[in-house]
Design a protein with these regions (language model features):
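Short alpha-helical transmembrane segments in multi-pass integral membrane proteins
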Residues: 1-65, 107-150
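Cytoplasmic juxtamembrane regions at transmembrane-helix boundaries
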Residues: 8-11, 83-97, 101-103
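Short hydrophobic/aromatic segments of transmembrane alpha-helices and their interfaces
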Residues: 23-24, 70-72, 82, 98-99, ...
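Hydrophobic positions within alpha-helical transmembrane segments of bacterial inner-membrane proteins
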Residues: 26-34, 71, 75, 101
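Membrane-interface junctions at transmembrane-helix termini in multi-pass inner-membrane proteins
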Residues: 67-93
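Alpha-helical transmembrane segments of multipass membrane proteins
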Residues: 75-79, 101-106, 132
C-alpha cells in the first residue's frame, strides 16, 4: 500500500521500527533461552539424560546468541517481498542454504558438534547480510529517483 502510493520514507521508518522492536525481543528472549533454555529440555525429554540435556544446552546457547540476525531475516525478507520484489528474498533462502551447508560440511569434517550447532546462525548471518544489502540498494534507488517522500 505504501509502496504503491510512493511513500518510501514511511516504509523506511516501518523497517527501522520493526527491526528495533524485533531486536529488543531477540535480546530479551535470547537471554532467557541462554540462561534457562536447559529447563525447556525437560518438556521434550522423558528421562533426565545428562548427555542429551548437555547437548541441547549447547545448541540452545548457540542459537540464542543469534536471534538478532534471525529477526533481520524475518523482517527484511517479508518486507522486501511486500514491496513487490518477490525474487530477491528467495535468493536469501539460497544464501541460507549455502551458509548452513558450508558450515555443516566444515563442522562434520572436524567432527564438531559446536560447528553443527552454529550452522543455523551462520545461515541467518549470510541471509541477513544479503537482505540488508538488497534493502539498502532498493532504498538508494528510490532516493536517487527522488521518490523518497512521506
Amino acid at each position: 500500500q505504501n509502496m504503491g502510493a510512493g511513500k518510501v520514507k514511511r516504509i523506511s521508518r516501518g523497517f527501522r521500527a520493526t527491526t528495533i522492536m524485533g531486536s529488543i525481543y531477540s535480546v530479551v528472549f535470547g537471554v532467557l533461552v541462554f540462561f534457562f533454555g536447559n529447563m525447556l529440555t525437560g518438556l521434550f525429554v522423558s528421562e533426565n539424560l545428562d548427555q542429551i540435556v548437555g547437548l541441547v544446552d549447547i545448541y540452545m546457547k548457540c542459537v540464542a546468541l543469534f536471534f538478532i540476525p534471525l529477526n533481520v531475516v524475518n523482517v527484511y525478507r517479508n518486507g522486501i517481498q511486500g514491496m513487490g520484489y518477490g525474487f530477491l528474498p528467495m535468493t536469501a533462502g539460497i544464501a541460507e542454504l549455502a551458509g548452513r551447508g558450508l558450515t555443516a560440511v566444515v563442522a562434520s569434517h572436524y567432527k564438531s558438534y559446536l560447528g553443527i550447532c552454529l550452522a543455523s546462525p551462520v545461515a541467518w548471518i549470510f541471509a541477513s547480510a544479503l537482505l540488508l544489502a538488497m534493502y539498502f540498494g532498493i532504498m538508494n534507488k528510490y532516493k536517487k529517483a527522488g521518490n523518497f517522500r512521506e
